[in-house]
Amino acid sequence: MAIAISPLDLLLDTENPRFVILQSREQADIRKYLVTYEDVCQLATDINTYGRLLPGERIVALHEDDKYVVVEGNRRTCSLQMLLNRELIPDGFAHRIPHTSASILTNCSNIEVDILSDRNSALELMTKRHIDGVKQWKPLAKKQFFAANYKNGQGQSIHDLSRITGV
């Protein structure tokens, strides 16, 4: 099941294995950890540049005690929360989170979130994403991607390909 919800109404997962080193697992502490150690400022910049979450990158949450707890997508959720409400940005990081336009605020104010029934149902998803990981393209496939999209200047420009791929 999927619902449309504001990222501000989502809770970051206090049981996320990334946060094992945190002594306090309040939402503000989790956000500070994510911006300090998990490159969330860059992710917020990327979301701001793109204008929304990338297609296919839906957040996954559990419905627990009348709250929605993110089990997959804590970094994306944190980024969106800080883009939507600058008061949530931890001290010392405001200069690293871009100011957003009205259109981006509109695009990100309500997002589609997949809802799972219990934490056990999230285990397979988390394993595939964080332990097995997405299989990277081999070098030849990467070359083919750039060649097919550049097409001797008839397709994307080198600048556009660099912006799209980060290479």
Language-model features: where?
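Short, charged/polar connector segments at secondary-structure boundaries
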Residues: M1-S101, S109-V113
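Amphipathic, charge-rich alpha-helical segments that serve as recognition/docking helices
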Residues: E26, R31, A94-V167
